[in-house]
Swiss-Prot record:
Subunit (UniProt): Homodimer.
Family statement: Belongs to the tRNA pseudouridine synthase TruA family.
Active site (catalytic residues): D52
HAMAP family: TruA
Record field: catalytic activity: uridine(38/39/40) in tRNA = pseudouridine(38/39/40) in tRNA
EC main group: isomerase
Binding site for substrate: Y111
GO molecular function: RNA binding; tRNA pseudouridine(38-40) synthase activity
Role: Formation of pseudouridine at positions 38, 39 and 40 in the anticodon stem and loop of transfer RNAs.
Protein name: tRNA pseudouridine synthase A
């Protein structure tokens, strides 16, 4: 068997997320069907992360096995051809060792969350960023973010449906940068809880609106209660950027 590692980008707006589900179209299903069309083999695609409906990806990584060797550049061309008309594409493919696993071999995952912060919405960024018309206090958000860095119990920021065995995670990066009318939040960790990034963003926005003081983020974290945190930020602003191995 030959194991292939692919890097994928997609717009999640019209998709049901990464994972295959009955009755709806997912990224996993689109790619598995595309691979079958050119290889004749039913494969199971393993992704490095399971993005929700509406979440985008710039560098999602996945792997699959084929019984015969195909040149990686031909695999890229074939997948992109058969994945049409969906906004899903592969931009890298390479052979990987048989012990490589897109999910379990990962050492870190990187996300970006985009906020358009101006009085009027952006047509160009429709469904690709969270539009917030009220001015946000970015320095206050940056101050609050410091409390979340490091190893913590992130129960307050996990979805009620989260299936992770432990709420303990290590947030290695949480940078907030404002560029003109756009605010970007950069987050990285070895792994994340379900909705963890979006719940963190939703809480930091309350700080940015001066509804919360920066120090309240520490109280939310220590509460270990989802009800203590802010709302879940929209999926449209979230991008799965890359996975490190």
């Amino acid at each position: 068997m030959y194991r292939y590692k692919i890097t994928i980008e997609y717009l999640g707006t019209d998709l049901a997320g990464w994972q295959r589900q009955a009755g709806v179209m997912s990224v996993q299903q689109i790619l598995e069907e595309a691979i079958y069309k050119f290889s004749g083999e039913q494969v199971i695609l393993f992704g490095s992360g399971r993005t929700d409906a509406g979440v985008h990806a710039i560098g999602q990584v996945a792997h699959f096995d084929l019984s015969k060797y195909l040149e990686p550049h031909k695999i890229i061309t074939a997948i992109n051809y058969f994945a049409r008309p969906y906004a899903v594409g592969v931009w890298n493919c390479e052979l990987a060792p048989n012990n490589f696993h897109a999910r379990f071999s990962a050492t870190s995952r990187y996300y970006i969350y985009r906020i358009i912060n101006r009085p009027y919405p952006s047509v160009i960024d429709l469904n690709r960023a969270w539009w917030i018309s009220a001015p946000l206090d970015v320095p206050a958000m940056q101050q609050a973010a410091v409390y979340l860095l490091g190893k913590h119990d992130f129960t307050s920021f996990r979805a009620s449906s989260c299936q992770s065995k432990s709420p303990i995670k290590t947030l290695t990066e949480l940078n907030i940068i404002k560029e003109d009318e756009e605010i970007k939040l950069y987050l990285s960790a070895p792994s994340f809880l379900h909705h963890m990034v979006r719940n963190i963003v939703g809480s930091l926005v309350l700080v940015g609106k001066n509804i919360w003081q920066a120090e309240q983020i520490k109280d939310v974290l220590e509460a270990k209660d989802r009800k203590a945190a802010g709302p879940t930020a929209p999926a449209s602003g979230l991008y799965f950027v890359k996975t490190a191995y």
